[in-house]
Amino acid sequence: LLKRTTINFVNDTFRKNANWKILDIGCGYTAHKNASVIADIQDLSNFYENKNFIQITEKKLPFKDKEFDFVIASHVIEHVDDFEFFIKELERISSKGYIELPSRLGDNLVFENKNDHIWWFYFDDTANKLIVSKKNQLIDPFITVATAKLFEEIFRESLVIELAWEEKIDYKIDNQIRQENFKKISFFKLFRKYLSKKIRTIFK
């Protein structure tokens, strides 16, 4: 089962289940405060010296089957080359979790995403399925991660996909979306149009 959720709902669930063993994987320096175990490919043991931190060095995650009550994977899957194996691993080590991903728009807007992200996502609300395709850069990126975080406070549902899963993460690979089928949107062209419109407005 895969469905839309919000991080606020997840936080409320954690408050009601204080005894859960929770894994936050691939979180970098921003681990969830309720995480019992933190895991990342970077060695962040000094940063998380008072936490249970485990560095990931192998493709297969270093955890037992169903070891966790809940697993958080926030802004991780878009970076993983073999995302199908990673999803199977999430399903193996827990029976439920929270996934946060950039929307296709959110992905394209941010400078840092241009070379770091491999996959593109949208959620099919009818089939309750995550649709995955190879990333396409259709807009010249023009904002930083920090600016994107500010935008998310107001436009979160447009920039971020938040999903809760139980037992299985349903997804489908869709290779129909190809960059060559679309005309790339130039930021500078948009900016010129904006300036032109602004100038005409001023001198009306």
Feature annotation, model-predicted:
Residues 1-9:
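Conserved SAM-binding loop and adjacent beta-strand
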Residues 6, 50, 60, 65-67, ...:
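Generic intrinsically disordered, low-complexity segments enriched for polar/acidic and small residues
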Residues 9, 13-106:
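Conserved SAM-binding loop
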Residues 84-92, 96-204:
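S-adenosyl-L-methionine-dependent methyltransferase catalytic module, highlighting the catalytic core
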